[in-house]
Regions:
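Non-heme di-metal
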Residues: 1-242
């Protein structure tokens, strides 16, 4: 008998399979990933380089920013290979923004911040980034597996390349939080952002899957479409308890 975790894995694998076999659905989901990578260009407090007093941390941020720009190009090419439009989504539909809506922690640097305040905000940024990257990496693992069944081979190559970077990002972002703060404070920051991401995942998944099922209902197999609608109800219910 499957465990609850096994059931979730089975459902997610099936959902990604149903998405990649339809170029329209596939393009829409790739646009969700792309808009997450583009997010730092649309806000003014992401990757707060001014807060980094450690040259190695600053270099890690610059490398991360460059890799995200490369991911934008990879996703855009994958979407175009599917003959679908590259979209700029409203910020409330971008996962980074949804996570931030579930916590009051700020990493916007202001002139009055002293060194300790800047260090704490930088740690909050990396805590946020760690759990964002961890969730995206897991989603990409499902997606790259499903891409073997896509109508075009390029998305699989693009997603695999992004995934390699994301797995490295997951590791280093956690390490930076632990480098910046004493152990107890680092654990508190990581716990705060773990909770924010957990709630955001339920929120974002329910909204985005619900939208796909409403706006693209005919593109899903009828019985599985009904099943996925049931899943969105479960997600919304879980969010009220999270």
């Amino acid at each position: 008998m499957l465990s609850p975790h096994g059931v979730v894995n089975t459902v997610k694998r099936r959902l990604h399979r149903d998405i990649v076999v339809d170029p329209v659905l596939h393009g829409l989901v790739l646009n969700l990933y792309l808009n997450g990578e583009r997010y730092p260009h649309r806000v003014d407090d992401y990757f707060p380089l001014a807060a980094a007093t450690d040259a190695e941390i600053e270099e890690l941020m610059r490398r991360h920013m460059a890799e995200e720009d490369r991911h934008i190009a990879l996703y855009a090419k994958a979407i175009q290979k599917l003959e679908q439009p590259v979209l700029e989504l409203p910020l409330p539909d971008v996962y980074n923004e949804v996570i931030r809506s579930h916590t009051t922690a700020s990493f916007a640097i202001v002139a009055s911040d002293d060194a300790d305040a800047r260090g704490l905000k930088l740690a909050h940024f990396f805590g946020h980034l760690h759990f964002l990257e961890k969730r995206i990496a897991r989603s990409l693992e499902y997606h790259v597996e499903a891409c073997a069944h896509a109508v075009c081979s390029y998305p699989e190559k693009a997603v695999a390349a992004v995934l390699r970077d994301e797995l490295r990002h997951v590791s280093y972002t956690r390490d930076v939080v632990r480098h910046l703060l004493p152990a107890g404070e680092a654990a508190s920051v990581l716990s705060l952002h773990a909770g924010a991401e957990r709630r955001a995942n339920l929120d974002f998944s329910a909204r985005q899957l619900g939208r796909l099922l409403r706006e693209q209902a005919s593109r899903f197999p009828r019985m599985r479409g009904a099943f996925y609608r049931g899943c969105t109800s479960i997600l919304r219910g879980a969010l009220t308890c999270a």
